[in-house]
Amino acid sequence: MLRRLFVSTFLIFGMVSLYAKDLEVSVRSENTLLPIHVELNIGPNDAKQTKYLRSLCSIFVKDLALGDRLQPLLVKSGEISAPFSIVISSHYPELVFTLSRGTHNPRPFHSLVLTEDIAINRQKIHEVADKIHYALTRVPGISSGKIVFSLSKNPHDGELKQGELWSVDYDGENLRALTQENSLSITPNWLNIGSNNPYFYVSYKFGIPKIFLGSLENTSGKKVLNLQGNQFMPVFSPRKKQLAFISDAYGNPDLFLQGFSPSQGAMGKPRRVLNESFGTQGNPSFSPDGSKLVFVSNKDGRPRLYIIQVDPEIQTPRLLTKKYRNSSCPSWSPDGKKIAFCSVIKGVRQICLYDLSTGKDYQLTTTPIDKEGPSWAIDSHHLVYSAGNSGESELYLLSLITQKTNKIVIGLGEKRFPSWGGFPNNQ
C-alpha cells in the first residue's frame, strides 16, 4: 500500500543544465529514431509494489516514444547495449533516473517521490519522461500536457443539448470533469501562462454564449467581458496579453481584440479589428509572437483563411491559401512555421497544413469522416483533432513525423473542440 507522503520532485546536481549538454543528440532526419534502453532496478519490494513499479516503467517507455524521435526499449538487467540508456532505480517510494551515454559513467539525472495518488504519480512520470526527451533531443516532450475538450451526449426529445468540459492525458488516462454547469460549454483554449493552467471557453449557461475563464485548479468559470451580444472562439496571446474573439455586438460576427491579464482581467475596452464590409469572421489563432492572427472569413463567398498583422498596428488582411476554398479552424504552430486547418475536400472535411516558409499547403488526412478543431502539441509536430458526424465524435492524435493517427479511447459521448496545452514549463 502506498504511503501518504509529501510530493517532492527535484533535479539532482542541476543535471538538466549541465549533463543534458553531454547527452544532447541531433536527430538529423525526422524518420530517424534514437535507440534507448531502459532498465528497471527494483529493490526488495512486495509483489504489489513490484507490479505497480513495472506499470509506471511501461508508461515511461510509452511517453519517451510518443514524440517519434526516440526508440525506447525495456530490457533486463545487464542487457543494455544501446548508445543511450536510462536506469530507473527504486528505493521505494523514491525513484532515481540515471542516464548514460555509451561508456560514459552513469550520472543521476532526476528523482521523484511517489504518492498514494495514482494520477499524481502518472503525471510525475510524464514530466520526467518529457525532461529526458528534451535533454536528449532539444525538442520538448509532449506526454505531460493535458487535452481539454467538450463532451456531450445526445439529448432526449425536446431537451437542449448540454456539454461539459473535461481534461484527459494523451493516452486516455486521468479523465477528469472540469465544468459542472448543466449547460453547453465549448471551444476551450489554453492561455499557456501562469501556474494554475488557465483556459478560456464559451458557455451558454446565461442563455447566450459568453466567454469564461477557468483553470485546472478552479473549474468554476468566471465571466470575462462586459460586452453585449454573442461571444465565440476565444484565443489568447501570452506574449502580447491579448484576447482575440468573435462577437456580433455590432450586428455582424466580427473579430475583436481585448487586453487581458489572468490576474487583473480585461484591461481597457475591446477593439473591433475589421468592419462589417469584410464579411463574417471566425476561428482566430495567434502567431506565437502575438503580432499576427490567422482567421476565417467568407468575404469572397466561401470561408477562406486570411492573415492579419495586429501589432504594432492593424494592417489589411491578406489571403493565405488559394488552393482550398472551404476552410476553417486554423491553428498556428508553437514554432511559428506552420498552420493546421480544416478544408472540405471531395465532400469531406480533412486536416490540412500550410507551410509558411514555402507557401505550400498539404492534405494530412484522407479517411471519409469529417475532422475539425486541430490543436498543436508543444513540439509543433503533433496534433489532436476531433473526427465524427452529427451526434458522434472522437479525439485523435496525428503525428506529422510518421503521418499516423491514434484514437484516444475515452468512452461514450461526443468529444469535440480539443485544445492541447497545460505543459509544465520545465523542459
Swiss-Prot record:
What is its subcellular localisation? Periplasm
**Which range is the signal sequence, renumbered to this chain?**
1-20
Where does this protein chiefly localize? periplasm
Q: Which domain of life is it from?
A: Bacteria
Q: Which SUPFAM superfamilies does the entry link to?
A: Tricorn protease N-terminal domain
Q: Which GO terms describe its cellular component?
A: periplasmic space
- UniProt keyword annotations, A-Z: Periplasm, Signal
Q: Which InterPro entries match?
A: 6-blade_b-propeller_TolB-like (IPR011042), PD40 (IPR011659)
- Which family does the record assign? Belongs to the TolB family.
Q: Cross-referenced PANTHER family, in alphabetical order?
A: PROTEIN TOLB (PTHR36842:SF1), PROTEIN TOLB HOMOLOG (PTHR36842)
| Protein name listed in UniProt | Protein TolB homolog
Instruction: Tell me what organism the protein belongs to.
Output: Chlamydia felis (strain Fe/C-56)
